């Protein structure tokens, strides 16, 4: 079993890995020992691989989800679970299905903005368990991280695309 301060669990590599790496570096610079691991393909083994103080998870909507995440309490009874909420909008303004229900309201929740924070409060999350932080993936569009991404000209050359045409890019796990 690996002892870490922070375990960041990712679900979708294409969506979450870059921001998990960014978060890992930021936490390591503050002296934390951090591991990143994927929830799949060995979801059932994940809670037995790590002993952590903080567990950063991609989602926790209801008790069924918490049945899994709470398995981490077995080896880390004081672990703090933080829901990064990689999905904060469900496309339905009258009822956001990404808001926590049941026991998932008791953990910490990252909020990208005031609207989601209001939804968290309405769903019964304690205000002290809401972390307003913005979307981690957007940090790559702000200095000094903008230089990490390749610009349109470089991408056009690399993939033999016409830089003057509109592109439609599809993100997928590779």
Specify the residue positions occupied by each region the protein language model found.
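Short, surface-exposed loop and linker segments with low hydrophobicity and enrichment for Pro/Ser/Thr
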Residues: 1-2, 164
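Active-site and donor-binding regions of nucleotide-sugar-utilizing enzymes
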Residues: 3-149, 157, 170-173
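Conserved donor-binding/catalytic core segment of Leloir-type glycosyltransferases
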Residues: 162-174
